[in-house]
UniProtKB/Swiss-Prot annotation:
(2E)-4-hydroxy-3-methylbut-2-enyl diphosphate binds at H96, H185, T250, S317, S318, N319, S380. Dimethylallyl diphosphate binds at H96, H185, S317, S318, N319, S380. This is 4-hydroxy-3-methylbut-2-enyl diphosphate reductase. InterPro entries: LytB/IspH (IPR003451). Keywords: 4Fe-4S, Iron, Iron-sulfur, Isoprene biosynthesis, Metal-binding, Oxidoreductase. Catalyzes the conversion of 1-hydroxy-2-methyl-2-(E)-butenyl 4-diphosphate (HMBPP) into a mixture of isopentenyl diphosphate (IPP) and dimethylallyl diphosphate (DMAPP). Acts in the terminal step of the DOXP/MEP pathway for isoprenoid precursor biosynthesis. Its cofactor is [4Fe-4S] cluster. Pathway: Isoprenoid biosynthesis; dimethylallyl diphosphate biosynthesis; dimethylallyl diphosphate from (2E)-4-hydroxy-3-methylbutenyl diphosphate: step 1/1; Isoprenoid biosynthesis; isopentenyl diphosphate biosynthesis via DXP pathway; isopentenyl diphosphate from 1-deoxy-D-xylulose 5-phosphate: step 6/6.
C-alpha cells in the first residue's frame, strides 16, 4: 500500500480535520478549570521551588502537558462543541492520563472497545465522528474509518507524524526501519503500519543483539523466535538487515535512542566500510523536543539533594516511566503514581508502581523532620494533578 498517497488523499477529504474547528475560545474556560493550576504558576514564578514549613518542594523545570498533548485535548473538546449531538468515538486513549480520559467519557465520547487485544469497530457507522488520539492510529484504521464514511478528527502529534514520514522515506529507498520502541505501544503500532520492512527493538540490549547478528555472530532460528512479534511479515534477518534506517517512538529515553543510532552506524561502517556507509545506513533525527526537555530537566533535578521523588503520570505512559527510571538510576527513593488519590494523608502511605512490578502500598511515605521532595510529571499530566499532589504533601507535612 502506498501510505504516502493514502495520507495525501485523506488530508484532502471534506470528512477529515486536523486543524480544529476555530472554537478555541469557546472551550478555553473548560480546559482551564479542568487542567490548569494557579499554585503551579506561582511555583514556576518562584524558581520552581516551594517552602511550606518543614516541606521543601523542587519542581522539574520542564514537566507536564507538552504542546502536542495540549493540542490533542483542546481539539477533542472542540470536536464535542462542534458536534454536540453526533455520536463521537475515539480510537484509543487521547493521551495516557486517566483523569483526562475520564473527562472525555463524561462528555459522552465513546472509546472503541477492545476484545482480546483487537479493536472492535463494528459499532462505528457512516456519519459518526471519530477522533484519532495524540499517538496516532494505524493506516489500516484510518482506511477503515474513511471507507466507512466517518468524519475523522486527527489529533496526532506532529512529532509522531514526523516519524511516519521518516519510515516512509526508509520504505521508498528500500531501507529496513529499525524502530526503537515498545512493540505494543499505540505509537509504535501506528509507526510500523507506515513502514515497509521493519524491526522493533526495545532497548540497547536488543539493539546489540541485532548488531551482533549483522556482523555474523548470531543464530537465525533464535533471532526469528526472539523478534517474531516485533517485525514486519516475512522478515528475513539475512536479507532485511543489509540497509538500515533508524526511527523511534517519540517518548523513549533520548540517550538510549541516540546510542542505538550510533550502534547501528558503527555496525554498518564495520561491515561495509566508509565508502559504502551511506548505501547501508540512514541517519535520523526523530527525537521529540518535549520528551528531551523533560528528561533533561529531570537529570538536573536529580542532581539536587532530595529525600524523595514523586513522578506523576499514567502507568502506561512511556515518557513518564522513563522519568522514573532516571530517578531510580540515581538511587533516589522515588514513587510513580498516576493520580493524586494514590496518596493517603490519613495513613501517610502511598500506592505506587515500582519499575517492572505491580502496584504496591508503602507506609511512612513522608519522613519526619525537614524533607526535600522532587516532583515531575509526564507529558500527559495536567498541572491540576500536580497541584493536588503538592497539596497532599503540604497536609502531610503539617501532621
Amino acid at each position: 500500500m502506498d501510505t504516502h498517497a493514502f495520507k495525501r488523499s485523506l488530508h484532502h477529504s471534506e470528512r477529515y480535520n486536523r486543524r480544529g474547528f476555530g472554537r478555541a475560545e469557546e472551550v478555553a474556560e473548560s480546559l482551564e478549570q479542568a487542567y490548569q493550576s494557579g499554585l503551579i504558576g506561582t511555583i514556576r514564578d518562584n524558581g520552581y521551588r516551594l517552602e511550606h514549613g518543614r516541606l521543601n518542594v523542587r519542581l522539574a523545570e520542564a514537566f507536564g502537558f507538552c504542546w502536542g498533548v495540549e493540542r490533542a485535548v483542546a481539539m477533542a473538546y472542540e470536536t464535542r462543541k462542534h458536534y454536540p449531538s453526533e455520536r463521537l468515538w475515539i480510537t484509543n486513549e487521547i493521551i495516557h492520563n486517566p483523569s483526562v480520559n475520564d473527562h472525555l467519557r463524561e462528555m459522552d465520547v465513546q472509546f472503541i472497545p477492545v476484545e482480546q487485544g483487537v479493536k472492535d469497530f463494528s459499532g462505528v457507522t457512516s456519519g459518526d465522528v471519530v477522533i484519532l488520539p495524540a499517538f496516532g492510529a494505524t493506516v489500516q484504521e484510518m482506511q477503515l474509518l474513511n471507507e466507512r464514511g466517518c468524519h475523522i478528527v486527527d489529533t496526532t502529534c506532529p512529532w509522531v507524524s514526523k516519524v511516519w514520514n521518516t519510515v516512509e522515506k526508509h520504505k521508498k529507498h528500500t531501507f529496513t526501519s529499525i524502530i526503537h520502541g515498545k512493540v505494543k505501544h499505540e505509537e509504535t503500532l501506528a509507526t510500523s503500519s507506515f513502514a515497509g520492512t521493519y524491526l522493533v527493538v526495545l532497548d540497547l540490549e536488543e539493539a546489540q543483539y541485532v548488531a551482533d547478528y549483522i556482523l555474523g555472530n548470531g543464530d537465525r532460528e533464535d533471532f526469528i523466535k526472539r523478534f517474531a512479534k516485533a517485525c514486519s511479515p516475512g522478515f528475513d534477518p539475512d536479507r532485511d538487515l543489509e540497509r538500515l534506517g533508524v526511527a523511534n517512538q517519540t517518548t523513549m529515553l533520548k540517550s538510549e535512542t541516540e546510542e542505538i543510532g550510533r550502534l547501528f552506524e558503527r555496525t554498518m561502517l564495520s561491515k561495509y566500510g566508509p565508502t559504502q556507509l551511506n548505501d547501508h545506513f540512514l541517519a535520523f533525527n526523530t527525537i521529540c523536543d518535549a520528551t528531551q526537555e523533560r528528561q533533561d530537566a529531570m537529570f538536573s533535578l536529580v542532581d539536587e539533594p532530595l529525600d524523595l521523588m514523586v513522578v506523576i503520570g499514567g502507568f502506561n505512559s512511556s515518557n513518564t516511566t522513563h522519568l522514573q527510571e532516571i530517578a531510580v538510576s540515581r538511587g533516589i527513593r522515588s514513587f510513580h503514581i498516576d493520580t493524586p488519590e494514590r496518596i493517603d494523608v490519613g495513613s501517610n502511605s502511598i500506592e505506587h508502581k515500582p519499575l517492572a512490578a505491580d502496584l504496591c502500598r508503602e507506609g511512612d511515605f513522608l519522613p519526619e523532620g525537614p524533607v526535600r521532595v522532587g516532583i515531575t510529571s509526564g507529558a500527559s499530566t495536567p498541572d491540576r494533578a500536580v497541584e493536588e499532589v503538592i497539596e497532599k504533601l503540604m497536609q502531610l507535612s503539617e501532621n
